[in-house]
Amino acid sequence: MDFYNSYSQGFVRVAACTHHASIGDPTTNAASVLRLARQCHDDGVAVAVFPELTLSGYSIEDILLQDLLLEAVEDTVLDIVVASADLLPVLVIGAPLRYRHRIYNTAVIIHRGVVLGVAPKSYLPTYREFYERRQLAPGDDEHGTIGIGDLRAPFGPDLLFAAADLLGLVLHVEICEDMFVPVPPSAEAALAGATVLANLSGSPITIGRAEDRRLLARSASLRCLAAYVYAAAGEGESTTDLAWDGQTMIWENGVLLAESERFPKGEHRSVADVDTELLRSERLRMGTFNDNRRRHRALVEPFRRIEFRLEPPVGNIGLLREVERFPFVPADPQRLQQDCYEAYNIQVSGLEQRLRALDYPKVVIGVSGGLDSTHALIVAARAMDREGRPRSDILAFTLPGFVTGDRTKSNATELCRALGVTFTEIDIRDTATLMLKKIGHPFSRGEVSYDVTFENVQAGVRTDYLFRLANQHGGIVLGTGDLSELGLGWSTYGVGDQMSHYNINAGVPKTLVQHLIRWVIASSQFEEQVDKVLQSVLDTEITPELIPSDGEEKLQSTEAKVGPFALQDFSLFQVLRYGFRPSKIAFLTWHAWSDPNCGKWPPGFPEDKRLSYSLKEIRHWLQIFVQRFYSFSQFKRSALPNGPKVSHGGALSPRGDWRAPSDMSARIWLDEIEREVPEE
């Protein structure tokens, strides 16, 4: 596999093209098509889609009935066939063609000098400004072979064009109105296996119609788990009674990958790389997709499959799509605000229901002054407010150990006071020292020994205190560990931070926690003094504070052990949501993180923390992730306490999104990294 080649990584480059139409002049239109086709060829495009009735113009009306025009269209189709012999893209071109006793509005699919097939428009609008049935016949029930000059090609709406040398590229074509009907041809085609759905459109523009198209194209891509490539007619079409905007767009599974400006001058293209591997993954996971196929077997099975060899380009041709650095954290400010609002309230409502079900016990929580416990505390405070319970029912304990920092301890103390919760400090050092002495640990004899036992004794003592305090006060222990820590197994099992009575952070990744706290500050959920402490928490480095510093080295850093959470959350999302192989994850990570100046950052993200990572670093931390996720940490997830799912990226509950054996080897994933991911 060529690691740097996007086609090798499951991507297919597609283009939606529009041009200056010359109505009634097929030769001029064909020249425009070929210019755009050559540009697409140079850019490594696999599929290029043009507007409806590309060669004649859409607004030609009764001129469609002229033999001279129809013959000229056929001649230019043949010219394009010859001229495209050495071009990479599959060309999807609109043309009025004669078949039997009628004229059909068709898409001619051409590749490397061959007409692969001809797809007629199924549904002809004859309402409001449209009068297509006056000149044209519907093709919804046609399933035959059409002649274009001396060429013969399959004809019908039931054609799938599959690349024999590129797993995942299966093209279907529909035309304009076809996507406006309740059951469009593309829906049946997707069930039959199409992954790229093309729409050649005329679609004159009126106020609001562009948004209608966007909704329909987005919905089609989401429902069909497919890419939807849309190209509308634009400049040059007749404005006798109508106007045209040349809208082009590419959607993938509900996500907009590319869109051109509207009302463009001249020739324009929207180009993007569609992830067919992602689409196939989604279909495999969503069993109801195949159930729907079985239900509509009679419509799906007759589809004809035409194979061709694409012969995609080799080497690094870039990646023409945005890869979000933080897949759990959208860079769009409006979306981020909405996500934070929903995530926070999912957590609050989850805790509210648990409190109601238990007849309002006290909430016992260990507060360290770090991100996770801080966020859990403000969720608990809001839940109490909404349920009309006093915040004093939250029993917050700070449990300083051998290396608890002054700043984190101060953050915890000030936050609890500002919120008005019941706050107590219990120093665990005496208890931890006693346990270390009882088990004969070298630290109890004055030796420097900061091993895993030293760490876990502290973590275990803290949790033991919290559970006994919950017993004493009639409360429940509120867990604070987040999704990222669960994915990496960065927790102490059993009598440790892995266990609680209810964990509201279990579905929230570390990278999102920071933005949730920022959102809480920005949306003024609490008083000004609370906001000041929350900002101080955000400015503190992530550390479990279990191992002392020697005075010169930095305090124990979690990210130095398990990797940057930005990278590990990226990997976790790709595994949970799509099940991608490590080399695909490395490829995506490299495109997302190799250059801090490319792509968008979430709003408010600190400038000094906008880092980049080399492929060597990405490879190293991916190996750590794979080892910990697949081989080391599943036993901790198999015994998770309850907690709400938050992100569309997934969760790790063994009762929900992630069910896996606790005794599995990570060998095949590690081997794939060694084999397929270069170091530079």
Curated annotation (Swiss-Prot):
Documented EC number(s): 6.3.5.1
Binding site for deamido-NAD(+): 456, 485, 490-493, 636
Pathway(s) served: Cofactor biosynthesis; NAD(+) biosynthesis; NAD(+) from deamido-NAD(+) (L-Gln route): step 1/1
Keyword terms, alphabetized: ATP-binding, Ligase, NAD, Nucleotide-binding
A single MF term (Gene Ontology): glutaminase activity
Domain CN hydrolase: from-to ranges: 12-276
UniProt-annotated catalytic positions: 52 (proton acceptor), 121 (for glutaminase activity), 176 (nucleophile)
PROSITE patterns listed in its UniProt record: CN_HYDROLASE (PS50263)
Binding site for ATP: 366-373, 480
Binding-site residues, L-glutamine: 127, 203, 209
Listed Gene3D superfamilies: Carbon-nitrogen hydrolase, Glutamine-dependent NAD+ synthetase, C-terminal domain, HUPs
NAD in keyword set: yes
GO biological process: NAD biosynthetic process
InterPro entries: C-N_Hydrolase, C-N_Hydrolase_sf, Gln-dep_NAD_synthase, NAD+_synth_C, NAD/GMP_synthase, NAD_synthase, Rossmann-like_a/b/a_fold
A GO CC term assigned to this protein in UniProt: cytoplasm
Catalyzed reactions: deamido-NAD(+) + L-glutamine + ATP + H2O = L-glutamate + AMP + diphosphate + NAD(+) + H(+)
HAMAP family (alphabetical): NadE_glutamine_dep
Role of this protein: Catalyzes the ATP-dependent amidation of deamido-NAD to form NAD. Uses L-glutamine as a nitrogen source.
Family per record: In the C-terminal section; belongs to the NAD synthetase family.
This protein's name: Glutamine-dependent NAD(+) synthetase
Organism whose genome encodes this protein: Mycobacterium leprae (strain TN)
Lineage: Bacteria, Bacillati, Actinomycetota, Actinomycetes, Mycobacteriales
